């Protein structure tokens, strides 16, 4: 008895090794539904279960195929060709196999045959592979990544100035982002150690004291007045303020009047002031009655 028990597994193993795998079919919802039929792929049907012309033309006919499962139970299916759908199907007996094995959509049915006896067929099944739960989480994480709020770095408060322009410092956070420090409030520009705003206020005060009038024409401030010695007061005012004479000054001198164009450069705006004053003293002219043109450019 012991020797026979040892020989049985050997025979079963040898028989399983002699089986030839034909094809696998993943059952669809219609294969396990109310249609009571299993669709066989055309390439596999014509290769392993060929039908003659008479069987193909009559869908009611067909072949009766006998299969054996892993438990040794026999299963008989009617195999035929449907002209309406142009497909090869197993009909009769298939619904009973589905109920017995409790097949569901996605399960796999395997067809085999004996390598020596081609007419001896086997059928087997296995459940659909289970997808791990974390796979969906990883996929969802790849499609919809989480967004984290990164802390805002504290930028240094000291800024360097060069030629009245601020340098924008960049700081690499190590996460692919660059943060630039933007300073909205610019300090008052200083030209030759004298603030522009203070110089402008001094000019307005001097104009009021001399009784001059100010006119804005075509976006240019025109300063007109009849007081004498306006040039001297302007030069004295500039020298007393610590040499805050603008970098460029063009003076046009006439016989009875003086036209002075002053260009002031600052960080925020350009101030253009034109002063016109009548001169009673003609000691500024080398020749009386003749106009002269002078350019005074301070660099």
Swiss-Prot record:
Q: Which GO terms describe its molecular function?
A: DNA binding; DNA-binding transcription factor activity
Renumbered residue ranges of the record's region Disordered: 1-21, 226-249
**What is the source species?**
Arabidopsis thaliana
CDD domains in the record: B3_DNA
Which keywords belong to this entry?
DNA-binding, Nucleus, Transcription, Transcription regulation
Instruction: Show the GO cellular component annotation of the record.
Output: nucleus
- Keyword Transcription regulation (UniProt): yes
SUPFAM superfamilies assigned to the protein according to its UniProt record, in alphabetical order: DNA-binding pseudobarrel domain
Q: From the record, give the transmembrane residue ranges.
A: none
Q: Which gene encodes it?
A: NGA2
The name under which this protein is listed is: B3 domain-containing transcription factor NGA2
């Amino acid at each position: 008895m012991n020797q026979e028990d040892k020989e049985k597994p050997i025979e079963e193993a040898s028989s399983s090794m002699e089986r030839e795998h034909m094809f696998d079919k993943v059952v669809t919802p219609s294969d396990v539904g109310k249609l009571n039929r299993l669709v066989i792929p055309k390439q596999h049907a014509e290769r392993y279960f060929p039908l003659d012309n008479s069987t193909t033309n009559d869908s009611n006919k067909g072949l009766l195929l006998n299969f054996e499962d892993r438990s040794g139970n026999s299963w008989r299916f009617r195999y035929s060709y449907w002209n309406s759908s142009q497909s090869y199907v197993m009909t009769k007996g298939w619904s009973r196999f589905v109920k017995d094995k409790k097949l569901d959509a996605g399960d796999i049915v395997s067809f085999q045959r004996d390598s020596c006896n081609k007419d001896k067929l086997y059928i087997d099944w296995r459940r659909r592979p289970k997808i791990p739960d974390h796979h969906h989480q990883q996929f969802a994480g790849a499609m919809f990544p989480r967004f984290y709020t990164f802390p805002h770095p504290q930028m240094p408060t000291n800024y360097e100035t060069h030629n009245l322009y601020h340098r924008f410092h960049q700081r690499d956070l190590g996460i692919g982002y660059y943060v630039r420090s933007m300073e909205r409030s610019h300090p008052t520009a200083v030209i030759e150690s004298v603030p522009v705003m203070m110089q402008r206020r001094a000019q307005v005060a001097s104009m009021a004291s001399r009784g001059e009038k100010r006119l804005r024409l075509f976006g240019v401030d025109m300063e007109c007045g009849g007081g004498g010695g306006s040039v001297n007061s302007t030069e004295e005012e500039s020298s007393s303020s610590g040499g805050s004479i603008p970098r460029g000054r063009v003076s046009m001198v006439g016989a009875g009047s003086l036209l002075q164009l002053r260009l002031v450069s600052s960080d925020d705006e350009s101030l253009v002031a034109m002063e016109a004053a009548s001169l009673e003293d003609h000691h500024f002219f080398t020749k009386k009655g003749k106009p002269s043109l002078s350019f005074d450019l301070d660099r």
